[in-house]
Design a protein with these regions (language model features):
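Extracellular low-complexity, O-glycosylation-prone stalks/linkers
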Residues: 1-60, 64-90
Length: 90
């Protein structure tokens, strides 16, 4: 299970996502960033199972995004966690 998805360090084109896994070691994590204005997937990134944060940039300013975090555990994705984040202005 992945818990405590936190968004911090906001900039005009991005932010940092960090999380705390519990219940065992994960094979990998997938972060999906979706623009909430047009529901287009902005980024889909795969990280190693020992990564617990990611700086995300290259997004649109003053835009709301949904950040989804999926953990791959023993070959299966566990229930994802989500957090909403809004980039700042230039």
């Amino acid at each position: 299970m992945v818990v405590n998805l936190t968004i911090s360090d906001f900039t005009w084109d991005g932010f940092t996502a960090s999380w705390s896994p519990s219940g065992g070691e994960f094979d990998s994590f997938v972060i999906e960033v979706t623009n909430l204005e047009n529901f287009a997937e902005s980024q889909n990134l795969t990280l190693s199972g020992d990564a617990f944060s990611l700086g995300i940039s290259g997004l649109n300013p003053n835009t709301s995004y949904m950040v989804g975090l999926y953990g791959l555990y023993q070959g299966s994705f566990v229930e994802p966690v989500y957090s909403e984040a809004t980039t700042g202005g230039k």
